[in-house]
Swiss-Prot record:
Gene name of this polypeptide: pi4k2a
EC number: 2.7.1.67
Topology versus the membrane: Lipid-anchor
Entry protein name: Phosphatidylinositol 4-kinase type 2-alpha
Organism whose genome encodes this protein: Xenopus tropicalis (Western clawed frog)
Region called Activation loop, residue ranges: 336-356
Lipid tethering residues (S-palmitoyl cysteine): C167, C168, C170, C171
Nuclease as UniProt keyword: no
GO annotations of cellular component type: cytoplasmic vesicle; dendrite; endosome; endosome membrane; Golgi apparatus; growing cell tip; membrane; membrane raft
Region (Important for substrate binding): 150-152
Length: 471
């Protein structure tokens, strides 16, 4: 018996293994008449690429079309996985706001302006990288604050926070806040404002933008230039890149408000030149809305220089031929900007208390008006409304790659406590000053081993005070 011939059991039917007898000359292996391989299991065979092959199909048909099963089989698994991942990432970075077409239109204008090299301009004030976004006419339409350029972000272009971290690391950051979540805090404040119908926060949402004026790492800029060069010199290679330009940055996109000035400027003017009674009433009502917003989100960075006042006292000419004029009633509006340091996971209890600086204003000593009670109390007294607010914030905050459910529960527990105190203060007819003097409360969801259709909560007071307390 030849050593190279296959071993066959003596009891097995003798099968003809003379492959050449059933095949055309030059073909080492062929199929048996019944369409099966005429070979012993375990023997390596080579299947001919003939036109009658039931597996390969027609050899003359050429390469398989893209997307066909054969084409997908030939594509490496790693490459397919990377392609799907790149497509998913591109979908996440697409700015879509179906529920707010007006906001979507502003974002589209900003994107078109960037394509035409009308780039965002960095704002010199502040301790983080923030930018004035313009339209194609060069007009400022929004303020964009990238996540990684926040006060404690890795690419913050302002050196003040870097110097603070280097020289005084023990006082660096705010331990009551979730770091690098300022863009979500900005968008969350706008969400709370809309839910409560306060209408004092310019609409703010999470947006992806890319611009040469943003602060990128050297590696990102080199990669971008290399990809552009490859696309110009070797188009076949450059077309395989998922992205050619700089990577988009995620951040808060807040609509720009015109005609406003720092509150400190107008408050000094009003102190020297008191407002008429009706106008002063408008200011008080707007101020109370600011108090409600700041208190619920527990804003840790509210001074008199980061909220705005617009004071209009228009005069229309009644006739061009005489000096008669019609004086309209002045209009006052407040815009609450810079909400990036809110939604703490605990009440401040370390070095600083981070007070509300509006608490020292004369307006803070006046009891809450009936108008603000009628607007706010029916909402925050309704458990279903509060639950919906929590769910909306959850859908917003979970978009962050570093989202932590445990930290979010702590943030919501603080917010529930603030809502509880505010509800009681409005019912008792207190003033904003008396409200901020109320002991801070945390309302957590109670853990139960038994299933229940309704949630229960536990209430606790914070006994520890900051080292530098303001009361």
């Amino acid at each position: 018996m030849d050593e190279t011939s296959p071993l066959v059991s003596p009891d097995r039917d003798q099968t003809d293994y003379s492959y050449q007898s059933q095949c055309s000359p030059g073909v080492p292996v062929c199929l048996s008449p019944n369409g099966r391989f005429s070979a012993v299991p375990g023997v390596v065979v080579r299947i001919p690429g003939s036109a009658t092959s039931p597996i390969r199909g027609s050899a003359a048909s050429g390469p398989s079309p893209p997307g066909s099963p054969c084409d997908r089989e030939r594509q490496p698994l790693l490459e397919r996985s990377q392609t799907r991942g790149a497509a998913a990432q591109a979908e996440r970075e697409r700015n879509k706001f179906p529920d707010d077409p007006e906001f979507a239109e502003v974002v589209k204008k900003a994107e078109k302006a960037i394509v035409r090299d009308i780039l965002p301009e960095r704002i010199s004030q502040g301790s983080s990288g923030s930018y004035f976004v313009k339209n194609e006419q060069g007009e400022i339409i929004a303020v964009f604050k990238p996540k990684n350029e926040e006060p404690y972000g890795q690419l913050n272009p302002k050196w003040t926070k870097w110097l603070q971290k280097l020289c005084c690391p023990c006082c660096f950051g705010r331990d009551c806040l979730v770091l690098n979540q300022g863009y979500l805090s900005e968008a969350g404040a706008s969400l709370v404002d809309q839910k409560l119908e306060l209408n004092i926060v310019p609409r703010t949402k999470v947006v992806f933008l890319a611009s040469e004026t943003f602060n990128y790492s050297a590696i990102d800029r080199v990669k971008s230039r290399g990809k552009r060069l490859a696309l110009e010199k070797v188009p076949k290679v450059g077309q395989r890149f998922n992205r050619i330009g700089l990577p988009p940055k995620v951040g808060s996109f807040q609509l720009f408000v015109k005609g406003y000035k720092d509150a400190d400027y107008w408050l000094r003017r009003f102190e020297a030149d008191p407002l008429p009674e009706n106008t002063n009433r408008q200011l008080q009502l707007q101020f109370e809305r600011l108090v409600v917003l700041d208190y619920i989100i527990r804003n840790t960075d509210r001074g008199n220089d980061n909220w705005l006042i617009k004071y209009d006292c228009p005069m229309d000419s009644a006739s061009a031929r005489d000096d008669w004029v019609m004086v309209k009633e002045p209009v006052i509006k407040i815009a609450a900007i810079d909400n990036g340091l809110a939604f703490p996971l605990k009440h401040p209890d370390s070095w600083r208390a981070y007070p509300f600086y509006w608490a020292w204003l004369p307006q803070a000593k006046i009891q809450f008006s009936q108008e603000i009670k009628d607007l706010i109390l029916p909402k925050i007294s309704d458990p279903n409304f509060v639950k919906d607010l929590e769910e909306d914030l959850y859908e917003l905050f979970k978009r962050d790659p570093g989202f932590d459910r445990g930290q979010f529960r702590k943030q919501i527990a603080v917010m529930r406590g603030q809502i509880l105190n505010l509800t009681q203060a409005l019912k008792d007819g207190k003033s904003p000053l008396q409200l901020v003097q109320t002991p801070p409360v945390i309302v957590e969801t109670a853990r139960s081993h038994q299933k229940s259709t309704s949630e229960s909560y536990t209430q606790s007071f914070q006994s520890r005070k900051p080292f530098f307390s303001w009361w």
